[in-house]
Amino acid sequence: MIRSRASRTSAVIVCIVLALAVAAAAATLNGVLPGPLPLFPRTNWWNADVSQAPLDSSSANFISFIGTTRRLHPDFGGEASPGSDEVYGFPYVVVDGSQPKKAVEFDYSDESDGVNHTTDQSVPFYPIPDEAIAHAHWIEGGQPGNVDLRSTSDRHLLIVDRDNRHLYELYNVFFDGTRWHAGSGAFFDLNINGRRPDTWTSADAAGLAILPGLVRYDEVFGPNEIEHAFRVTVRSTNGYVYPASHRAGSTTGALPMGARLRLKASKSLTGFRPEIQKIFRAMQRYGLIVADNGSDMYISGTFDTRWDNSILNPAFGALTANDFDVIQRGWQPIAGLPGPPTNLRIVSGQ
């Protein structure tokens, strides 16, 4: 059969349209995040200006507990060695709204989203791309999802639905060949300030979202100031305060989950490279939020092969815990904001 030029042209157009549709639906590792930025509304705790917040009455004691000479460390970077599966920092995945949802079996199902809490059954909820099963670098630590490292690594998987501005975060993931497993999982609508219910975890020990508190390459080297706080870990914690919702320790003298540290305004940033000054300015204005137990004064950021740790490590190491103050525990910029805890775990059929 001889096809007309018009029919051949139509066929080409159809193929192009289909190809573009597939491309649009493709999951992207460390893809472009949906605006407006920063993530979450301006009134969110991650985006609150704490430069004028009052000091905590025990600020000096908390800093002493950490160790006044304890140096900061950037807990992020690129590959452990060129071409290796192992990575430093948090990868994140950007998908579109049509990404198929997967059910996840949880160790802490009673505090996780994507679960019918009447029957305790997981439901299709998390838009996990298939690439995370066998591809390196899609999950924290770097190894693919079908490698079981749950006993030795946190294995976070962070997913952003760019069309709906939804954030899905999973802790301690593993794909067993049939289905996904995780320690816990949380959903955050980036359009609103939905806090986890008190005593509930998320994919992070404090019950907070992870991605909004990461040092990101695109922000550090972009034209604008960084307008959010950063996630920080300390070796021990004692309870929790707003904005956290979950405890993971009761060590006397330690900071609570959700505590905020602020780089002193008197700390001179002269001599640091421009991109480092930008990071440190954000620490002065937005501070750090204690979100997990780990190494003292480790600042969380994204995995990105463009990071240069020969620059980052000594720059961060020039700051010590004594360069920071602890602001008043539970402080909020405006009383009552952003509202009472919101249960985001309700699913259809519950």
List each language-model region with its residue ranges.
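Intrinsic disorder/low-complexity segments in short proteins, especially the signal peptide
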Residues: 23-25, 349
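Pro/Thr/Ser/Gly-rich low-complexity, intrinsically disordered linker/stalk tracts
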Residues: 336-350
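N-terminal secretory signal peptides that target proteins for export/translocation
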Residues: 1-6
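Short, surface-exposed polybasic-aromatic patches that bind anionic ligands, especially phosphate groups
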Residues: 27-335
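Intrinsically disordered, low-complexity segments enriched in polar/charged small residues
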Residues: 8-13, 350
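Bacterial N-terminal signal peptides
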Residues: 12-21
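Low-complexity, intrinsically disordered regions enriched in charged/polar residues
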Residues: 23, 40, 338-340
